[in-house]
Curated annotation (Swiss-Prot):
Belongs to the FliD family. Homopentamer. Disulfide bonds: none annotated. Keywords: Bacterial flagellum, Coiled coil, Secreted. GO terms for cellular component: bacterial-type flagellum filament cap; bacterial-type flagellum hook; extracellular region. It comes from Aeromonas caviae. It is found in: Secreted; Bacterial flagellum. This is Flagellar hook-associated protein 2. GO terms for biological process: bacterial-type flagellum-dependent cell motility; cell adhesion. Residues 403-436 form a coiled coil. It comes from the Bacteria. The keyword Transport does not apply. InterPro entries: Flagellin_hook_IN_motif (IPR010810), FliD (IPR040026), FliD_C (IPR010809), FliD_N (IPR003481).
């Protein structure tokens, strides 16, 4: 049934009456739902912000609780920064120490070269195969009848089994083609060998009339405090325990023509460790600030709530997390036999629960009891790991905060259904009002019509 303007017949503004009644009913039905939806969405947003802030802090704790996180080493090498001779990197477990290192020679790959009349003239009249070997690496390349030097070069370089060998062609001044093959494999005794499975491909073999070896493969060699060490590559990995030494060039010579040693000092990297602990302090404070903001209670002015609190105002979750964190900080360490808590090594807490780092006191603790500082923070039962695992109970899939989100999302779905039900009730209510006022309008029209007829009769009677 079409809805028309109520009161059109009687001239009375019944439409305004219906509109006012519907608005009042709408407020009665929908406002509680809207208020609850807004409140639920704000809480859901607050839970999301809290999860994100906790995750940011646990990322820092992941670094602190990782094996070797505090085993940072500062490495100083007496050499030119612009033209370094070697690079030294410390691994987890590296110890402090001092070494005198001389780089005697660098590792080299083997190379073969040969001059061909042309790079575009077919070399093969029949199918065949070339085999390349260097050390324990080998691969094969198919050569087709009619292949040129350029074709063979492309097939070698693009071969999926290629172990790093490279082939290049240099066009010489006399119009010929110089083939240069570099094995890509270094180390004593790992010279490149090339063999062909037919006479035509024999030209690629060293001593086959065209190709010859122009450089032998060799190992890198260094002298560490009088001990000669060799490596197939220019990297000496764990030749010195827990150190990775990469040689870049041969050492410089002194006035007598002898190679000079480069002094390598490895010490505890206090700056790096201090920066790591500062990240812990900053991350802790950032999370505290976020929880304080989210959990801020609403204020009251003249007994009226101002709705100026945080998204989790009055929520017990933030208080529980704050309590867990602060209690863990003051709990005696199970790892360190020297320090009971982090407050003994330079970390301080103010009356608002915020942390700060006394760098001087922390530096002294690292100097005197480095292992105990590491024990306090690191290890399975250290502060970082314990705090990390506890906080992740809140943020993990199926954890406390995820469960809260599930409940809140379920509440929102229920409220959406309530909104649909309220809208249906509102539609029925408006239809009932229009039917009711429509009947009234029709009755008023009849009454007006009857009154008009009586008035006409009365006028006629008076005139007669």
């Amino acid at each position: 049934m079409a809805i028309t303007s109520a009161g059109a017949g009687s001239g009375i503004d019944l439409e305004s009456v219906i509109s006012a009644s519907v608005s009042a009913k709408k407020a009665q039905l929908q406002q509680p739902i809207i208020t609850k939806q807004n409140s639920t969405q704000i809480t859901l947003s607050g839970i999301g912000q809290l999860k994100s802030s906790i995750s940011a802090f646990t990322d820092i704790l992941d670094k602190l609780s990782a094996p070797g996180a505090f085993n940072k080493r500062a490495i100083n090498i007496t050499q030119s920064k612009d033209d370094p001779i070697l690079k030294v990197e410390g691994k987890s477990g590296a110890s402090n120490g001092q070494y005198n290192i001389i780089v005697n020679k660098l590792a080299e790959t083997s190379r073969q070269e040969g001059i061909f009349d042309s790079s575009t003239t077919p070399l093969a009249t029949q199918d065949g195969q070339l085999t390349f070997k260097a050390g324990d690496k080998t691969f094969k390349v198919d050569v087709k009848a009619g292949d040129t030097l350029q074709d063979i070069r492309k097939s070698i370089n693009s071969n999926g089994d290629n172990f790093g060998l490279s082939v290049n062609i240099v066009n010489t001044a006399d119009g010929k083609a110089k083939l240069v093959i570099d094995s890509g494999i270094s180390g004593d005794g790992k010279d490149l060998t090339i063999t062909g499975d037919n006479a035509e491909l024999g030209v690629f073999e060293a001593g086959g009339g065209v190709m010859s070896q122009t450089r032998a493969a060799s190992s890198a060699e260094i002298n560490v405090d009088g001990n000669v060490l060799k490596s197939d590559t220019n990297t000496f990995d764990d030749s010195i325990q827990d150190l990775k030494v990469t040689v870049l060039r041969v050492s410089d010579k002194d006035s007598a023509g002898d190679l000079k040693a480069n002094k390598v000092d490895i010490t505890t990297d206090k700056t790096s460790i201090q920066e790591l602990v500062q990240q812990f302090v900053d991350g802790y404070n950032t999370l505290q600030d976020k929880m304080n903001s989210l959990g801020k209670r609403n204020t009251f002015v003249g007994g009226v709530k101002q709705d100026d609190g945080g998204a989790l105002a009055g929520d017990s979750t933030t208080r529980a997390i704050e309590s867990f964190m602060s209690n863990l900080l003051v709990s005696p360490s199970q790892n360190s036999g020297t320090y009971s808590t982090v407050f003994e090594i330079g970390i301080k807490m103010d009356n608002k629960g915020k942390l700060s780092l006394d760098k001087t006191k922390f530096g002294e603790a690292v100097d005197k009891n480095f292992d105990q500082v590491v024990a306090l923070f690191g290890g399975e039962k250290g502060l970082a790991s314990t705090l990390n695992s506890g906080l992740k109970e809140y943020t993990k899939s199926g954890g406390m905060l995820a469960q809260r989100e599930d409940v809140l999302n379920s509440d929102l779905r229920a409220l959406t259904q309530k909104t649909a039900t309220a809208n249906a009730q509102l539609t029925k209510y408006e239809a009932a009002l229009r039917a009711q006022y429509g009947s009234l309008d029709a009755l008023l029209v009849k009454m007006n019509s009857s009154a008009s007829a009586l008035a006409t009769l009365q006028t006629s009677y008076q005139k007669s």
